[in-house]
UniProtKB/Swiss-Prot annotation:
Disulfide bonds: none annotated. The keyword Transmembrane helix does not apply. This is Escargot/snail protein homolog. It comes from Cryptops anomalans. Keywords: DNA-binding, Metal-binding, Nucleus, Repeat, Zinc, Zinc-finger. PROSITE patterns: ZINC_FINGER_C2H2_1, ZINC_FINGER_C2H2_2. One of its GO terms (molecular function) is zinc ion binding. Signal peptide: none annotated. A zinc finger (C2H2-type) spans 1-4, 8-30, 36-46. InterPro entries: Snail/Krueppel_Znf, Znf_C2H2_sf, Znf_C2H2_type. Belongs to the snail C2H2-type zinc-finger protein family. GO terms for cellular component: nucleus. Coiled coil: none annotated. It is found in: Nucleus.
Amino acid sequence: IRTHTLPCKCHICGKAFSRPWLLQGHIRMHTGEKPFNCQHCQRAFA
């Protein structure tokens, strides 16, 4: 039983999320965006 709504929907695959920041991280999976870099090894992360 769901107790919350899922107002944030991915325009690419239709998956729904309860929070905008969860949707933002999910969209990065589709786009391949990796905005965070390690200061030690320069590896990029989503």
